[in-house]
Swiss-Prot record:
This is Tetraacyldisaccharide 4'-kinase. The keyword Phosphoprotein does not apply. Disulfide bonds: none annotated. It catalyses: a lipid A disaccharide + ATP = a lipid IVA + ADP + H(+). It comes from the Bacteria. The keyword Nucleotide-binding applies. GO terms for molecular function: ATP binding; tetraacyldisaccharide 4'-kinase activity. It comes from Edwardsiella ictaluri (strain 93-146). Pathway: Glycolipid biosynthesis; lipid IV(A) biosynthesis; lipid IV(A) from (3R)-3-hydroxytetradecanoyl-[acyl-carrier-protein] and UDP-N-acetyl-alpha-D-glucosamine: step 6/6. GO terms for biological process: lipid A biosynthetic process; lipopolysaccharide core region biosynthetic process. The gene is lpxK. It holds the Pfam family LpxK.
Length: 331
């Protein structure tokens, strides 16, 4: 239902417009308060790059964060990542992720970033506390914030916005009548707009998410998509599950059933086991897999995806970050 409302296919958004106007007014006043110095802004002692979006729901921020971290690491930079840690409940904050940290403590996306990149990751509702926790453990050259565009309490040196190229901004209204956290005009003040899928518009950078090999949650065995010839069951607890199901179909994997869960869903073993009564393969996203490894069955698989950007555009982004680091004394 909410997808129909936000996409503009249902007139029910009209009932939510008063709440949207209130949301928009509060968001505008809040941003102005930070810009005018009425509320204190904390600046990190090193360059900070924000990766965020203007809409609610999954747009591909985390794959871009992973791409940035990996590319910067290859160039010899010491990179840290901070996040709100949505979906996790730690006993205390800030929490710096370690080898035994669970997704229920830190959230699924921070754990995925840490596992994929090996970078130091910290979570806290107050992002400045997360940055300080990272710096207390080891020197860094740059910090990347996963989903912090609207966290104006934290000063930033570079803003990257990811948008879904298929859904764009839906009906264009603020939450809850539409998907917008801020109006589309905010794009005029960011450093780069990265479009995940669809057709990029002038000045936007296209990004594709690619993956062809599935990994077994228990054994780590890898299989190319073409090896799945019998119908499988697919599940996804991400911002936009249909994208994952469409990806599997494009890879030629026959789907017997699909199950969409809420983003950051906390899973129970018996619920997922019931999805495959004939012991069919159960396919999921890598983000879901980090929450299911502890109780995974033998025939559960996940599809890792990686972000790809045009070489020239990607090099420009990395060069701008390198320039920020070069202007900062190295610790």
């Amino acid at each position: 239902m909410i997808a129909r409302i936000w996409s503009g296919r249902s007139p029910l958004y009209l009932l939510l417009l008063p709440l949207s106007w209130l949301y928009g007014l509060v968001a505008l006043l809040r941003r102005q308060a930070y810009r005018r110095g009425w509320i204190r802004v904390w600046r990190a002692p090193l360059p900070l790059v924000v990766v965020g979006n203007l809409t609610a729901g999954g747009n591909g921020k985390t794959p871009l964060v992973i791409w940035l971290v990996e590319q910067l690491q290859r160039r010899g930079y010491r990179v840290g990542v901070v996040s709100r840690g949505y979906g996790g409940r730690a006993t205390c904050y800030p929490l710096v992720l370690g080898p035994d940290t669970r997704s229920v403590e830190c959230g699924d996306e921070p754990l995925l970033i840490a596992q994929r990149t090996g970078a130091r990751v910290a979570v806290a509702p107050q992002r400045s506390a997360a940055v300080q926790a990272l710096l207390a453990q080891e020197p860094l050259d740059v910090v990347i914030t996963d989903d912090g565009l609207q966290h104006y309490a934290l000063a930033r040196d570079m803003e990257l916005v990811v948008i879904d190229g298929e859904r764009r901004f839906g009906n264009g209204w603020w939450l809850p009548a539409g998907p917008m956290r801020e109006r589309a005009a905010r794009l005029c003040s960011v450093d780069a707009v990265i479009v995940n899928g669809g057709l990029p518009r002038t000045g936007e950078i296209p990004m594709a998410l690619t993956g062809h090999t599935l990994v077994n949650l228990r054994s780590g065995e890898r299989r190319v998509a073409g090896q799945f010839v019998t119908p499988v069951v697919a599940m996804a607890g991400i911002g936009h599950p249909p994208r994952f199901f469409h990806t599997l179909t494009q890879l030629g994997i026959p789907l017997q059933a699909t199950h969409a869960f809420a983003d950051h869903q906390a899973y129970q073993a018996q619920v997922l086991a019931a999805l495959t009564p004939q012991a069919q393969p159960l396919l999921m996203t890598e983000k879901d897999a980090v929450k299911c490894r502890a109780f995974a069955q033998d025939n559960w698989w996940y599809l890792p995806v990686s972000a790809t950007l045009p070489a020239e555009a990607g090099d420009r982004l990395l060069a701008r970050i390198a320039a920020l680091v070069a202007a900062q004394p190295r610790g």
